[in-house]
Design a protein with these regions (language model features):
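Basic, amphipathic alpha-helix used for nucleic-acid engagement in HTH/winged-helix/SANT-Myb modules
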Residues: 1-12, 56
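A short, Lys/Arg-enriched amphipathic alpha-helix from helix-turn-helix/homeodomain DNA-binding modules
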Residues: 10-48, 69-87
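Basic/polar phosphate-binding segments, predominantly the helix-turn-helix DNA-binding elements
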Residues: 41-70, 94-115
Length: 136
């Protein structure tokens, strides 16, 4: 099996790191209300000055995951955090993440195995148990 030159391996790591940084910055901007639409792979490729297919293939080769994996994991991280805030409705959370309510529920359940409402109830119950154990 041929061995890839070290320069090529380094470039794959650089592209992957730049992509993950761009995803994190983009989601921070969406969460901060500075942008109201989610980027697609073409948008990230344009930011990194490379072809979308090259970006996708490079990330997949370097990490074993498609680019959408990193994007979706970051969205799930934000969704979980927001669901712990009882003052936010699920509709508000969906809108903040640029989903409509039903698509957000499907998206969340695909990754978490429960609906956003069920997740919220489970974590509210575990918070109450923790408070009781600590005598608060």
């Amino acid at each position: 099996m041929p061995v890839l030159p070290k320069k090529y391996q380094t470039r794959k790591a650089e592209i992957t790191a730049d992509f993950i940084t761009a995803v994190n910055e983009h989601i921070d901007q969406v969460m901060g209300g500075r942008i109201d639409k989610m980027y697609h792979i073409q948008d990230f490729a344009r930011l990194l000055f490379i072809h979308p297919v090259h970006l996708s293939n490079t990330i997949k080769l370097h990490t074993g995951h498609a680019p959408c994996y990193f994007f979706e994991m970051r969205l799930m991280e934000e969704a979980r955090k927001m669901l712990l805030d009882q003052t936010l409705t699920i509709t508000d959370i969906a809108a903040k993440l640029t989903f409509d309510n039903s698509n957000f529920t499907k998206f969340f359940k695909r990754f978490e195995g429960v609906t956003p409402s069920q997740y919220r109830l489970q974590h509210a119950a575990s918070s109450e148990v923790a408070l009781q154990v600590n005598g608060l």
